[in-house]
């Protein structure tokens, strides 16, 4: 696993964070050291797939990055009569995802598309995964995407939505942010790396509160919604049709 050192030296003109070649190369290390509970979420996605994915249906991973979620799903399927569709708008991510998926033999077909997830038709879906993806879309586009997902899910289909959260209580918000930064420092990131990455992300990662997510999911059509995992200001929700 290549180590993330992208923000280890001072960057004079710090642009917005993008999922470019340099990020794709170190992404597994970056996300493990940056997102508390990421491995637990990936493991649980497989458990949910085991329970919810049905024969003859499709599974979508929207914002699939290098394919960790897809592999977890595929390992846990009860049938190979399923198609998994992974979508990411980063060509470097897609190339590595295809290579990663192809390194493991399976009879379950997987299609990896380089596209904007807003352009993808969702149909005959038993499971849709949005793993730290929605927060990178413009807020104005989020309800439309979730509504499309709801309509594309079969009855008893599941959406897994993992996000970084904001909190309305200022003291709690500051505490959880500080704990997250402590987590990153404990994983070897310097103060400079934490600061520069935060600055690079502030215009492209627009986070919402848990309440906002729940309200939006209800507007999209879901009625069974629950936060099933949280670690500091990161977490994951499930919504069942």
Curated annotation (Swiss-Prot):
Disulphide-bridged cysteine pairs: none
InterPro entries found in the cross-reference section: CmoA (IPR005271), Methyltransf_25 (IPR041698), SAM-dependent_MTases_sf (IPR029063)
Keyword check for Transcription regulation: no
Enzyme Commission (EC) number: 2.1.3.-
Keyword S-adenosyl-L-methionine: yes
Catalysed reaction, written as an equation: prephenate + S-adenosyl-L-methionine = carboxy-S-adenosyl-L-methionine + 3-phenylpyruvate + H2O
Annotated signal sequence range: none
Cited CDD domains: AdoMet_MTases
Record keywords: S-adenosyl-L-methionine, Transferase
BP term (GO), one: tRNA wobble uridine modification
Residues that span the membrane, as ranges: none
Ligand binding (S-adenosyl-L-methionine): 38, 63-65, 88-89, 116-117, 131, 198
MF-aspect GO terms: carboxyl- or carbamoyltransferase activity; S-adenosyl-L-methionine binding
Membership in a protein family: Belongs to the class I-like SAM-binding methyltransferase superfamily. Cx-SAM synthase family.
Function: Catalyzes the conversion of S-adenosyl-L-methionine (SAM) to carboxy-S-adenosyl-L-methionine (Cx-SAM).
Subunit architecture: Homodimer.
Protein name: Carboxy-S-adenosyl-L-methionine synthase
Source species taxonomy: Bacteria, Pseudomonadati, Pseudomonadota, Gammaproteobacteria, Pasteurellales
Gene (UniProt): cmoA
């Amino acid at each position: 696993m290549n180590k993330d050192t992208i923000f280890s030296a001072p960057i004079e003109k710090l642009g917005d964070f993008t999922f470019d070649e340099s990020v794709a190369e170190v992404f597994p290390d970056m996300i493990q050291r940056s997102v508390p509970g990421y491995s637990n979420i990936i493991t649980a996605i497989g458990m949910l797939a085991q329970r919810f994915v049905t024969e003859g249906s499709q599974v979508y991973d929207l914002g699939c990055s290098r394919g960790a979620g897809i592999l977890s799903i595929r390992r846990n399927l009860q049938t190979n009569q399923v198609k998994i569709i992974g979508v990411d708008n980063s060509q470097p991510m897609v190339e590595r995802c295809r290579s990663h998926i192809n390194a493991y033999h399976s009879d379950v077909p997987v299609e990896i598309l380089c596209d904007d997830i807003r352009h993808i038709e969702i149909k005959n879906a038993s499971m849709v995964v949005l793993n730290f993806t929605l927060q990178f879309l413009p807020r104005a586009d989020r309800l439309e995407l979730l509504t499309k997902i709801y309509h594309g899910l079969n009855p008893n289909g599941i959406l897994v939505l993992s996000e970084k959260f904001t909190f309305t209580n200022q003291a709690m918000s500051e505490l959880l942010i500080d704990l997250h930064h402590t987590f990153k420092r404990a994983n070897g990131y310097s103060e400079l790396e934490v600061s520069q990455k935060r600055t690079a992300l502030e215009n492209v990662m627009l986070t919402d509160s848990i309440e906002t997510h729940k309200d939006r999911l209800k507007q999209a059509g879901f009625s069974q919604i629950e936060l099933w995992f949280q670690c500091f200001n990161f977490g994951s929700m499930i919504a069942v049709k």
